[in-house]
A protein has these predicted regions:
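Sequence-level detector for tyrosine residue identity
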Residues: 6, 10, 26, 89-92, ...
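Amphipathic alpha-helical segments enriched in hydrophobic/aromatic residues interleaved with Lys/Arg
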Residues: 104-159
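A short, N-terminal "cap"/entry segment at the start of jelly-roll beta-barrel domains
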Residues: 1-19, 137-143
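N-proximal short alpha-helices
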Residues: 11-21, 44-45, 121, 128
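N-terminal regulatory/effector-sensing and dimerization cores
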Residues: 18-111
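Generic low-complexity, intrinsically disordered sequence content enriched
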Residues: 1-2, 33, 49-50, 142, ...
């Protein structure tokens, strides 16, 4: 098999109408890197793989995010990030989560309550395994949109069924 790509090397995905950019993003920041406060134009979930990241937002004021932790930032949130150590994380950007199971969604909406304080969630073993398998593929120049769609659905499935 030529190369280490998940897709066939002879397919050019750049012109594909289903090319999905920046839905899943892998970030690798060196210690001290600062991302100034910026307004989220979409909802996002940040999945920490390695290191410590200081997040400052209305929902998470001064929270240090560590390996295996997740936070959700809503559309309109203003978020500032500082890498306290070398960090690796994956961000999932979305307007609406894909609806995988309508019954489960309705059950969650009936039971959901706004938290008094926002704290990071801890990734389950399955979710951590999924997230840590993504960086190599996401680092490719043009990751396959069908693969990204599948991984997004898998993320949502694991989150809605285990949290």
């Amino acid at each position: 098999m030529p190369g280490d790509s998940f897709c066939i090397q002879y397919t050019n995905c750049t012109g594909c109408p289903k090319n999905v950019e920046n839905i899943l993003v892998y970030r690798n920041l060196p210690k001290g890197e600062h991302i100034p406060k910026d307004k989220c134009t979409q909802n996002c979930m940040l999945f920490m793989i390695k290191g410590e990241l200081l997040i400052n937002s209305e929902e998470h004021p001064g929270i240090t995010l560590r390996e295996r932790q997740i936070v959700l930032q809503a559309i309109g949130s203003k978020v500032e990030i500082l890498a306290l150590t070398d960090v690796e994380y994956v961000v999932y950007w979305f307007n609406e989560l894909p609806l995988l199971c309508e019954e489960r969604y309705k059950e969650m909406m009936e039971q959901a309550e706004a938290p008094l304080t926002y704290t990071p969630l801890i990734m389950s073993e399955r979710l951590y395994h999924l997230v840590t398998s993504m960086p190599e593929f996401l680092a490719e120049e043009n990751p396959c949109s069908k693969y990204i769609d599948l991984k997004c659905k898998e993320l949502v499935f694991l989150i809605t069924n285990f949290y």
